[in-house]
Design a protein with these regions (language model features):
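S-adenosyl-L-methionine-dependent DNA methyltransferase catalytic core
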Residues: 1-122
Length: 122
């Protein structure tokens, strides 16, 4: 739904290298993970969205890197969240963050538990 800058797309040589390492044709959509050993796994979901310390190289459908907005969406950030930092910093923010919907769910359960505890004291 957004215009992806050409800088996010892999070169033809890099795409061919990754496709030649695959044993089967991956599903679409998929997130490709390349680990430090060069093993490439293709999954219909992202199992690792890590900060800069990770070697994992995430690629959408074997064609391009995730945009800053896409990484933050995976963590539950709303599209209204303003991104005014470089790509490398956005990757760290997304990789080190806690999923927003998870925090909301936990906070809601904590509030319920506190309400129940307070109503029992009366």
């Amino acid at each position: 739904d957004e215009d992806i800058p050409t800088s996010y797309f892999l070169s033809e040589a890099m795409k061919q290298k990754r496709f030649s390492a695959l044993k089967t044709i991956p599903p679409k959509p998929s997130i490709w993970h390349e680990n430090i050993g060069g093993n490439i796994s293709t999954l219909p979901y992202s199992c690792a969205l890590r900060a800069g310390g990770s070697y994992n190289y995430l690629v959408v459908n074997g064609e391009r890197r995730l945009t800053s907005r896409e990484m933050l969406r995976l963590q539950g950030f709303p599209d209204s969240f303003i991104i005014n930092i470089p790509y490398s910093q956005a990757r760290k923010v997304a990789g080190n963050s806690v999923s927003v919907p998870v925090v909301q769910a936990i906070a809601g359960e904590m509030i319920k538990a506190l309400d129940e505890q307070n109503s029992c004291k009366i």
